[in-house]
């Protein structure tokens, strides 16, 4: 509560927004039109949408001057999804615009979460976003393959899955 978080483009972050819709006193910065729609009608959520051109395929906005739009903005947490996760290639994306957004947000947030649905493991997309051992946490719907779990554990990357969250409740 009361933190400013960023929810990036993609359907995975949209589902995070839906899960947050019942929370009170949250503040969300996003460029994801689905996220803005999911949270925008809630009186207990403050939602700010980044301006700019709308990318209709991904349903997100891209500011003309990203650095100017985000100058002086600091976020407690940021949530991004990716198109592929590979042990050797790291996190990969299909959209160059998301790469610039990620790098800018990553530099201005306290804690980064990579939201990865289970279909993205052992896949590579067009371009590299970052290595798997970057400073972050992972959220996924199912347990990742064993080689990913071992990799993350050996580097101190916190992994949240449906089963670990259910155990904590």
Residue ranges and their predicted role:
Residues 33-169:
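Conserved phosphate- and dinucleotide-binding cores of soluble alpha/beta proteins
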């Amino acid at each position: 509560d009361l933190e400013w978080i960023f929810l990036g483009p993609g359907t995975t972050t949209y589902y995070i927004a839906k899960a947050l819709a019942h929370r009170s006193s949250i503040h969300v910065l996003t460029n994801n039109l689905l996220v803005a729609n999911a949270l925008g009608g809630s009186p207990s959520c403050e939602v700010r949408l980044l301006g700019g051109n709308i990318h209709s395929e991904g349903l997100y906005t891209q500011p003309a001057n990203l650095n100017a739009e985000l100058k002086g903005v600091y976020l407690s947490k940021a949530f991004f999804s990716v198109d592929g996760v590979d042990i050797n290639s790291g996190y990969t994306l299909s959209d160059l615009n998301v790469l610039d957004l990620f790098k800018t947000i990553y530099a201005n947030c306290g804690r980064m979460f990579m939201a990865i649905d289970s279909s993205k493991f052992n896949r590579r997309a067009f371009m590299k976003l970052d290595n798997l051992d970057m400073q972050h946490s992972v959220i996924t719907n199912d347990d990742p393959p064993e080689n990913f779990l071992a990799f993350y554990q050996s580097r101190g990357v916190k992994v949240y899955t449906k089963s670990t969250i259910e155990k904590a409740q």
